[in-house]
């Protein structure tokens, strides 16, 4: 009801059919505008119809958990194909060391305080 009163909508995405995703941000990030970065697990989901979905390259799923802030895209280092793809799309890609956080399934969105 609150969402509707403030002219927002919501969509349920059932992650039980996607066992490799710990939570939605594990496989999906907003890149600004109507563009999303997604893993193959979720890239074709019907809830994403109407969005431009950029799929992370094979074997680089962890890179899908990124943060777009102040015209820079913070990404985990060590995923060169994803970084190159995002750079080609015009993003200022800033790779960050995440290897220790990754050991405990932590990602960039886990470390951020969002507004």
Description of each model-found segment:
Residues 1-115:
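The feature marks the mature, well-folded catalytic cores of soluble enzymes
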């Amino acid at each position: 009801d609150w969402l509707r009163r403030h002219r927002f909508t919501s969509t349920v995405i059932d992650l039980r059919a996607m066992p490799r995703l710990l939570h939605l941000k594990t496989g999906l990030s907003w890149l600004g505008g109507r563009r999303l970065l997604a893993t193959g697990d979720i890239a074709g989901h019907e809830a994403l119809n109407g969005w431009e979905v950029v799929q992370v390259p094979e074997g680089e799923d962890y890179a899908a958990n990124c943060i777009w802030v102040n015209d820079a895209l913070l990404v985990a280092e060590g995923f060169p194909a994803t970084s190159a793809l995002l750079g080609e799309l015009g993003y200022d890609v800033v790779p960050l060391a995440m290897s220790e956080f990754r050991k405990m399934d932590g990602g960039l969105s886990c470390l951020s305080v969002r507004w």
